[in-house]
Amino acid sequence: MFRGATLVNLDSKGRLAVPTRYRDGLIEDAAGQLVCTIDIHHPCLLLYPLPEWEIIEQKLSRLSSMNPVERRVQRLLLGHASECQMDNAGRLLIAPVLRQHAGLTKEVMLVGQFNKFELWDETTWYQRVKEDIDAEQSATGELSERLQDLSL
């Protein structure tokens, strides 16, 4: 499971160093193979260990290519999916088209989200966190049943 937010840097070739606390697990569980694609709802990237991505692919394959909405989701997620192999130094090369989509330049937030990571431009990430906190503090609506059961 991946958790926490870590600032990492992209080098001039578009590579980022995976924090050491994740490297051994990614090598053990995925042989250092990951898949990066766009997030279709937010200006960030999604980075999955290959076994986790294969589960997503299976789910996507069950969608109908005749349904325009389902086909659009398939096209966006699969069409942007790029395999990334962690090198001996623990670095991943993020494809230029993906970096451009998320506005990634130098400082990048690697955010653990259970079975995957999100990659955010640092400034965009902190803006998003502020917006989310503001929204929660001003929320007056009913919580979903699942959120009501969440006790922190």
Curated annotation (Swiss-Prot):
<dbReference type="InterPro" id="IPR035644">
    <property type="entry name" value="MraZ_C"/>
</dbReference>
<dbReference type="GO" id="GO:0009295">
    <property type="term" value="C:nucleoid"/>
</dbReference>
<comment type="function">
    <text>Negatively regulates its own expression and that of the subsequent genes in the proximal part of the division and cell wall (dcw) gene cluster. Acts by binding directly to DNA. May also regulate the expression of genes outside the dcw cluster.</text>
</comment>
<feature type="domain" description="SpoVT-AbrB 1">
    <location>
        <begin position="5"/>
        <end position="52"/>
    </location>
</feature>
<dbReference type="GO" id="GO:0000976">
    <property type="term" value="F:transcription cis-regulatory region binding"/>
</dbReference>
<dbReference type="InterPro" id="IPR003444">
    <property type="entry name" value="MraZ"/>
</dbReference>
<keyword id="KW-0963">Cytoplasm</keyword>
<dbReference type="GO" id="GO:0005737">
    <property type="term" value="C:cytoplasm"/>
</dbReference>
<keyword id="KW-0804">Transcription</keyword>
<protein>
    <recommendedName>
        <fullName>Transcriptional regulator MraZ</fullName>
    </recommendedName>
</protein>
<dbReference type="InterPro" id="IPR038619">
    <property type="entry name" value="MraZ_sf"/>
</dbReference>
<keyword id="KW-0238">DNA-binding</keyword>
<dbReference type="InterPro" id="IPR020603">
    <property type="entry name" value="MraZ_dom"/>
</dbReference>
<dbReference type="InterPro" id="IPR007159">
    <property type="entry name" value="SpoVT-AbrB_dom"/>
</dbReference>
<dbReference type="GO" id="GO:2000143">
    <property type="term" value="P:negative regulation of DNA-templated transcription initiation"/>
</dbReference>
<dbReference type="Pfam" id="PF02381">
    <property type="entry name" value="MraZ"/>
</dbReference>
<dbReference type="InterPro" id="IPR035642">
    <property type="entry name" value="MraZ_N"/>
</dbReference>
<comment type="similarity">
    <text>Belongs to the MraZ family.</text>
</comment>
<keyword id="KW-0677">Repeat</keyword>
<keyword id="KW-0678">Repressor</keyword>
<dbReference type="GO" id="GO:0003700">
    <property type="term" value="F:DNA-binding transcription factor activity"/>
</dbReference>
<comment type="subunit">
    <text>Forms oligomers.</text>
</comment>
<dbReference type="InterPro" id="IPR037914">
    <property type="entry name" value="SpoVT-AbrB_sf"/>
</dbReference>
<keyword id="KW-0805">Transcription regulation</keyword>
<feature type="domain" description="SpoVT-AbrB 2">
    <location>
        <begin position="81"/>
        <end position="124"/>
    </location>
</feature>
